[in-house]
Amino acid sequence: MAKFAAIVLLILVASATVNAVKEHDELPTTGMSRKILLQPVFKSLIISIAEGQQCVKKDELCIPYYLDCCEPLECKKVNWWDHKCIG
């Protein structure tokens, strides 16, 4: 059941991301494609689902409120587009 919910969540996040990328092909300040910036997050999410993890390990990418860190780690912003599990 948890894997099914995670896959559905992945599909919802991916579709929202595709819509955001269609609306804004480039970031306003750097010109970098959003697709390039989001690839590591989706890779981390897919690996977590495949391994059956319920949480993300230390120093791995996370998504606040969607892909949480293992206790006692916290999902913190490390730069303007990435969040990592720090603790």
Curated annotation (Swiss-Prot):
Tagged with keyword Zinc-finger: no
Outcome, altering I63A: May affect protein secretion, folding or stability
This protein's UniProt keywords: Antimicrobial, Disulfide bond, Knottin, Pyrrolidone carboxylic acid, Sensory transduction, Signal, Taste, Taste-modifying protein
Signal found in the keyword field: yes
Signal peptide positions (record): 1-20
Cysteines engaged in disulfide bonds, as pairs: C55-C70, C62-C75, C69-C85
Modified residues (Pyrrolidone carboxylic acid): Q53
Propeptide: 21-52
Entry coiled-coil feature ranges: none
SUPFAM superfamilies: Gurmarin-like
Additional remark text: Named after the term 'gurmar', meaning 'sugar destroyer' in Hindi, for its sweet taste-suppressing properties. While Gurmarin has little effect on the human sweet taste-response the Gymnema sylvestre plant also produces gymnemic acid, a mix of triterpinoid saponins, which blocks the sweet taste-response in humans and chimpnazees, but not in other mammals. Gymnema sylvestre has been used in Ayurvedic medicine for the treatment of diabetes and other illnesses.
Protein name (record): Pro-gurmarin
Species this protein is from: Gymnema sylvestre (Gurmar)
